[in-house]
Structure formats: structure tokens, C-alpha cells
Amino acid sequence: MMTVATTEELYQRLLKSIREGVDLQPKMVNVGTVIQVGDGVAKISGLEQAMASELLEFPPKAGRSEPVFGIALNLEKDAVSAIILGDYLGIEEGDQVNSTGRVISAPVGQALIGRVVNALGQPIDGKGPIQTTKYRPIERIAPGVITRKSVDTPVQTGIIAIDAMIPIGRGQRELIIGDRQTGKTAVAIDTIINQKGKGMVCIYVAIGQKRAQVAQIINFLEKYGAMDYTIVVSATASESAALQYIAPYAGCAMGEEVMENGVIIDGQEVRDALIVYDDLSKHATAYRQVSLLLRRPPGREAYPGDVFYLHSRLLERAARLNEDYGGGSLTALPIIETQANDVSAYIPTNVISITDGQIYLETDLFNAGIRPALNVGISVSRVGGAAQTRAMRSVSDRLKIDMAQFRDLAAFAQFASDLDATTRAQIERGQRLQEVLKQPQFQPMPLEEQVVILFAGINGYLDDVPINQIGRFKSELVNYMRTAHPEVGKMIFENRLDRKFPSPEIRSAIEHMLKEFKQMSTFAEG
């Protein structure tokens, strides 16, 4: 027999609930129902108040102990289409979906330094949970013109060819573009390794890469001590297109936190961040997959119509802030993979038009042993020149033109049997400069050493050194400058040479080293 509670009993229960602090206020929850699901996309009815890019929750149920989240991307007349972040196989027709009233956010701040996380900011390195209470929306409007400052501080990549001819400044967006296996990632990783002790937090975002390749990159960063100031965001090829799509935005949010609020590295506050997107070609492919699954109309090469906005809203968030807003910076190095050296394809031309210059790496140069395989004619930096130190600017002013002319003359010389003395001398000097600019991976070179070596090459000091001895002469000159004239390197590094460059010490050191080098038997044999 069913018992019915009396009015007095109900009243006593209500009083008890009030004493225990139970919230009896009614809550409005926007709830929907899955009407169709497949390939990582769910179609949901009943979410009339859903916002664009809102985070949706698929609550736990039998067989699923944790909630699954999605992002509302298509707001249609009778339904909402959402991409599912995570395992969508457990989601079925008829499942409940809750609105959260917020957009997707990523954890940010000090606790992420040295960690490897997925696109949602969850740790995947086996080092335990990330202890942070700071979160930022992954999507955000880029800083306005009033908050920005012109680029005037260099990012030293440690790669002599780039620092001299295509300089990068803090707050710049510099594209690294080329075919597969031309050294694009190597340039980015060398740049990260070279930031040790330079007050820069680095973020490496792997999009659509193989897991083995990402693990190898992490091992290199740990080996060279770069993980002490680096965050790795990984959305590998084995993960869903939805996670690959949001990964660069999550990494950018982490970089913006450094730029605006700073972190502590080696006891010093750091407000400069460098972010590498490796690569945005695979990011565009992931977004194309998501868009086609959402039934959005395809355009050129089957990409959706807003694929330009996909990358422009990401890369515009790189900035140099003025002193009123903290003076921090976020420098972006996006990577694009071309097919058969075609830089005029859809995605490459989009990103070239967004960025402040590009570093173009060429397959033929790479196969010829010229590494980094930099094509000087196509590569350019639109703003980084203002960030070069005086000493580097003084030695590199002519270098790019000389190298571009050398490549043209070298191509012409293949078909010409008789060359005049001036042309021959120009080609021979260009060959020596080409050797000077060669550099092995994982061996970034300090600024002061770059300046001395370039000065020797540009001013003809190496004209009598055999080409196969240039590498050895470089290393011996650097060692001599370190031991005999350390004060010169310090002056170059601190940008104190002013108009005295080149100092007499640099000239005398090069001449002394050249004289000693000529006396060696190996020189004569060369």
C-alpha cells in the first residue's frame, strides 16, 4: 500500500533542506537529443539556444563513465551539428546532450612548461596531472592596432643563413615552406634549441604528424635541454580530425598567456613566446574533412569557403605588445608542405599572403648537400630586418643580393665555356659563401660567431682558402675568437659596436688565423 506524505511532513523536509544548504532554486538547462551520429559528427535536435562554437556535453551513461564533449559548428533551422572531441563510438541516437554555455578552453600558465599535452590540454607524457587553475578560450580576437608595437627585437634562430638574410623579429609571423623532407621541421627545432637562456618560451604544435616522429622530436628537445622552456601540443595523425583542427588554437592560447601575463623561467619573468605550427597543410586537410562531414559546401580543392579565415584568425594573434600592455610578444613559425615545389597552390598562397615573409626550402638544394636548403631568391622577411643588430646588418646588407646573383651566374656558367675574370671571381666567392652558410642540424651558432664568419667571407678573406677547407677554417676561427678576443664577441652580442664595426680586433684576428692556416700542410695539399 502506497503511503502519502502529509503536509506537515513535507514542511519538515523543506526546513531540513534549507538548514543543510540544499539549493532548491529551479535551474534552466538547455537539453537536446542526438538524432544522427557518425564519423565524429553528431546532429542534435532541441538545442534552440546553442551558440556558435559552444562546448556541448554528452553526459556519462552505461558503458561510459566520463562525459564526452563536442563543439557546435553548424547552427541549422531544426538541428545543431557538432564535432565530437574524443571517442564518438559510444554515442548513439537518442542520447542526451547538454549545453554548457561556454566555449572550449585550454589550460595555460606556468604548470604547462616542460609538458606534452593533447589538443585539449590534457597531459600525455605520463608525468601526472597538470596543476593549474588558469584556463583561456582557444578562440580569441587578435590584439588591435593600438595595443601593438613595431617589431624591433630579433629572434636568434642560430642558423647563420636565416639570421643574416631572412631575419625574424619577436612578434613576427614567418612561414617555413617547402616539399617533404627538405628540413622544415629541422629549422624550427634548431630555432627552439637556440632559445636556451634567451628569455623565450617555446610551444611546438604537432598537427597530423606520426607518433614516432613526435616522440623523436621530444627526445631531441630533452637531449638539448629545450624542454625546460617548451610546451609540446600533440594532435597526431591517429587522432580525430576535430582534435587536429583545434590543436593550433589551443597552443596559441598557451602562448598568449605568456605574452600577456608572463611565466617564470630560471628565476626570471618571461613575456616572449615562440610557437611552431607543424604543419598547417595538415591542419587545412583536417578542417576540410570536418567541413565535408558537416555538409558545408566545398570550394576550390574541396576546401570550404572560410579556409583563409581559418588560418588568418590564428596567425593574426601573433603580436608584439607595447609597454602599456606588458611589452610581451608571440612569434609564429607556421610550416606548410608543398607538392612538387608548387608554392602557387591554394593553401600555400593563402598562408604566404597572411604571414610577414617566408623561408623557402628547396628539394634540389637539399639533395645537393646545401643545408639548410634555403632558396634566397624566393625567401623574404618583411619586418625582421628592423630587428637585426647593427653588426649583423652591416655584414649581411650585401649578402642576400650576392647569393641570389651567384645562383643565377652559376646556372648560366653551366652553359658558358669562357667566362671573364670578374664573373669567375664572383662565382668563386659565391661558392665560398655557400660553404660558409652550410650548417649541420642541432648546431645553432651564436650571433657573435655568425658576424665574424660572415665578415671574413664577404670581404674576401676566404678567397684563397680551398672550398673543401672552409668548414675547418670556420671552426678554427671561432675557437680563436673565443679564446683570444672574448671581449669582441661580448660587444657584438650586447649590440655595443655602434659605428666602430668592424673593430680592428676582428680584422687582425681573421688575418692572424688566415696566416696560421696557410702555414698548415693540409692547406697546401688542398
From Swiss-Prot:
Main location: membrane
Subunit architecture: F-type ATPases have 2 components, CF(1) - the catalytic core - and CF(0) - the membrane proton channel. CF(1) has five subunits: alpha(3), beta(3), gamma(1), delta(1), epsilon(1). CF(0) has four main subunits: a(1), b(1), b'(1) and c(9-12).
Site feature Required for activity, where: 379
SUPFAM superfamilies: C-terminal domain of alpha and beta subunits of F1 ATP synthase, N-terminal domain of alpha and beta subunits of F1 ATP synthase, P-loop containing nucleoside triphosphate hydrolases
Family: Belongs to the ATPase alpha/beta chains family.
Bilayer disposition of the protein: Peripheral membrane protein
The name this protein goes by in its record: ATP synthase subunit alpha
Gene3D superfamilies: 2.40.30.20, ATP synthase alpha/beta chain, C-terminal domain, P-loop containing nucleotide triphosphate hydrolases
Enzyme kind, highest EC tier: translocase
GO cellular component terms listed in the entry, alphabetical order: plasma membrane; proton-transporting ATP synthase complex
Annotated ATP binding sites: 178-185
EC number: 7.1.2.2
Record's function text: Produces ATP from ADP in the presence of a proton gradient across the membrane. The alpha chain is a regulatory subunit.
Pfam families registered for this protein in UniProt: ATP-synt_ab (PF00006), ATP-synt_ab_C (PF00306), ATP-synt_ab_N (PF02874)
Catalysed transformations (reactions): ATP + H2O + 4 H(+)(in) = ADP + phosphate + 5 H(+)(out)
PANTHER family according to UniProt: ATP SYNTHASE SUBUNIT ALPHA, MITOCHONDRIAL (PTHR48082:SF2)
GO molecular function ontology, one term from the record: ADP binding
Cited CDD domains: ATP-synt_F1_alpha_C, ATP-synt_F1_alpha_N, F1-ATPase_alpha_CD
Keyword annotations: ATP synthesis, ATP-binding, Cell membrane, CF(1), Hydrogen ion transport, Ion transport, Membrane, Nucleotide-binding, Translocase, Transport
Location in the cell: Cell membrane
